[in-house]
């Protein structure tokens, strides 16, 4: 594909992410094309259909977040972590898109969030191999828990924010309010001992044995 085509492809995708995030998935291809500075025919040329365009947006958003998370978890350099935090407002279009996906539901939304869970399992494993993340008894379940609570928690925070339509401000405030408490829980733990965990684990294992 010619470089000009690649540039148009990326420009359309970026405009679509912004338009979907701002107006919802009911926005038309003509509006997306206008925002990208191209014709609706060129959108179809690159993506085939509106569903194809949304799928491309899903893939891009999921990969951008996976890449960012992996870089943070594999690094021992505070400069990397603080640099990402300084740029958190730049993630506003991606987060607006994810919020719309959570709110819209449907098969495409389920597919996107399944991909997010898959990616979480992948970057957590990268952290384990890098020695920055503790191994898990059940890596898949841990990834699912973190992806769902992370996405749902941000959605709830956004609903409680004084200006929920301003994603840049919401992300800035979210980082201020939530990063240190979450890091404390992840790093120091919450419960004073393993008694509750061991009790529920034994119960789960006993149930699995009965099923087997």
Curated annotation (Swiss-Prot):
A single MF term (Gene Ontology): DNA-binding transcription factor activity
Pfam families, per database record: TetR_C_25 (PF17933), TetR_N (PF00440)
Induction / repression: Expression is autoregulated.
Gene Ontology BP, a term: regulation of DNA-templated transcription
The organism's place on the tree of life at top rank: Bacteria
Known regulation of activity: Interaction with long chain acyl-CoA derivatives (oleoyl-CoA and, to lesser extent, stearoyl-CoA) prevents binding to DNA, leading to the expression of the target genes. Long chain acyl-CoA derivatives may serve as biological indicators of the bacterial metabolic state.
Record has Repressor as a keyword: yes
Keyword set includes Repressor: yes
DNA-binding region(s) in UniProt: 28-47
PROSITE patterns found in the cross-reference section: HTH_TETR_2
Keywords: DNA-binding, Repressor, Transcription, Transcription regulation
Domain spans labelled HTH tetR-type: 6-65
Disruption phenotype: Knockout mutant is impaired in long-term survival at stationary phase and does not persist during macrophage infection.
Entry remark concerning the domains of this protein: Contains an N-terminal DNA-binding domain and a C-terminal ligand-binding domain, which can accommodate a variety of structurally unrelated antimicrobial agents. The C-terminal domain is also involved in dimerization.
Function statement: Regulates the expression of the Rv1217c-Rv1218c multidrug efflux system and its own expression. Acts by binding to promoter regions of Rv1219c and upstream of the Rv1218c gene. Important for survival in prolonged stationary phase and during macrophage infection. May be used to eliminate non-growing mycobacteria.
Record's subunit section: Homodimer. Interacts with long chain acyl-CoA derivatives. Interacts with several drugs such rhodamine 6G, ethidium and safranin O.
Protein name, as recorded: HTH-type transcriptional regulatory protein RaaS
Organism whose genome encodes this protein: Mycobacterium tuberculosis (strain ATCC 25618 / H37Rv)
Lineage of the organism: Bacteria, Bacillati, Actinomycetota, Actinomycetes, Mycobacteriales
């Amino acid at each position: 594909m010619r470089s000009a085509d690649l540039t148009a492809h990326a420009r359309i995708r970026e405009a679509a992410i912004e338009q979907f995030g701002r107006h919802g998935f009911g926005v038309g291809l003509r509006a997306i094309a206008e925002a990208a500075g191209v014709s609706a025919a060129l959108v179809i040329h690159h993506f085939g259909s509106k569903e194809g365009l949304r799928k491309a947006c899903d893939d891009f958003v999921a990969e951008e977040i996976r890449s960012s998370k992996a870089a943070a978890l594999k690094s021992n350099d505070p400069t990397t972590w603080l640099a990402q935090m300084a740029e958190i407002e730049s993630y506003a279009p991606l987060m607006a898109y994810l919020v719309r996906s959570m709110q819209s539901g449907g098969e495409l939304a389920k597919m996107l969030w399944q991909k997010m869970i898959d990616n979480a399992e992948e970057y957590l494993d990268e952290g384990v191999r890098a020695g920055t993340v503790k191994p898990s008894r059940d890596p898949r379940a841990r990834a699912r828990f973190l992806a769902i609570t992370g996405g749902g928690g941000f959605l709830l925070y956004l609903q409680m924010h004084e200006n929920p339509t301003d994603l840049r401000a919401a992300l800035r405030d979210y980082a201020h309010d939530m990063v240190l408490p979450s890091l404390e829980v992840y790093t120091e733990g919450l419960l004073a001992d393993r008694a509750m965990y061991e009790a529920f684990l034994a119960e789960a294992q006993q149930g699995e044995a009965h099923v087997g």
